[in-house]
Amino acid sequence: MVPLDKDNQDICPICLDPLKEAVSTDCRHLFCRMCLIRHMDKASVSGVLSCPVCRKPCSETVLGDNYICHTHQKRVCRFCESSRHLLCEECLQSPEHRAHTELSIENAISHYKERLNRRSRKLRKDLGDLQRLKAQEEKMLQALQVDWGSHRPRTEQQNQDQTELQQKALPRHWLDQREDPPEEVAKVFNFSEAVTQLSILVSSLERMAKELDASTLKDASDLLDRSSQQKLEGLLSHVPPANSKLS
């Protein structure tokens, strides 16, 4: 373990790497949160918690409120995948959790970060496929628009018949040619909606993977549920099956 001095104040004395999620002990020494958690796990066996640098007594509360069980006021050490709750040692003794699968905090963060990254890579590929399909539909619609323009006059009344939502989503000249939007216009509009929603979902997955810690494990689990293939079938249900090639 490296001694603390002015030249390495941004270095964790335990892992010797730049501080990640830095936390300060009661004696004001800084550590990576996960490094300090692992230290406390080992120290809890002896029942004596102390600073790894100066050996002064150290409280579990320095980890932060999100790492303390609000029921028993003890440090959380496991994440229950069934209930999606952070558990302390006393929680683990409850009959409610004995049949559940629990991961250590460190393993849970690693496990869910990998799942989030894997899901975001998959959906980003799907998003690219969807954007290409949307571009194809737009080209077809542009070709049809030229044909409509040579046969159908544009009237002021026909312009007023278009909904405000469609006017925002598509170029106005595509919607001005007839009283009811053609099937091709609806397809492009639906693709645009799907692309927007899927883009938001991919961004959320990527951001969650980067910022994941113990306090957001439940949110990560919920996000993985929302981005499952079964849920995405509902998101993309308005895209014609013949045109949708998403896996």
Curated annotation (Swiss-Prot):
Asked whether the keyword Transferase is assigned, the reply is yes
Q: Record's Gene Ontology CC terms?
A: cytoplasm; IkappaB kinase complex
Catalytic reaction equation(s): S-ubiquitinyl-[E2 ubiquitin-conjugating enzyme]-L-cysteine + [acceptor protein]-L-lysine = [E2 ubiquitin-conjugating enzyme]-L-cysteine + N(6)-ubiquitinyl-[acceptor protein]-L-lysine
Spell out the disulfide connections: none
ZnF endpoints (B box-type): 64-105
Where is Zn(2+) annotated to bind? C69, H72, C91, H97
Which Pfam families has this protein been placed in?
zf-C3HC4
User: Mind telling me which SMART domains this protein's record contains?
Assistant: RING
How is the quaternary structure described? Interacts with NEDD8.
Its job:
E3 ubiquitin-protein ligase that plays a role in the limitation of the innate immune response. Mediates inhibition of the RLR signaling pathway by ubiquitinating RIGI and IFIH1 receptors, leading to their proteasomal degradation. Also promotes the neddylation of IKBKG/NEMO, stabilizing NFKBIA, and thereby inhibiting of NF-kappa-B nuclear translocation and activation.
Q: Give the family this protein belongs to, as stated in its UniProt record.
A: Belongs to the TRIM/RBCC family.
Q: What is this protein called?
A: E3 ubiquitin ligase TRIM40
Protein species of origin: Rattus norvegicus (Rat)
Give the taxonomic lineage as stored in the record.
Eukaryota, Metazoa, Chordata, Craniata, Vertebrata
Please name the gene that encodes this protein: Trim40
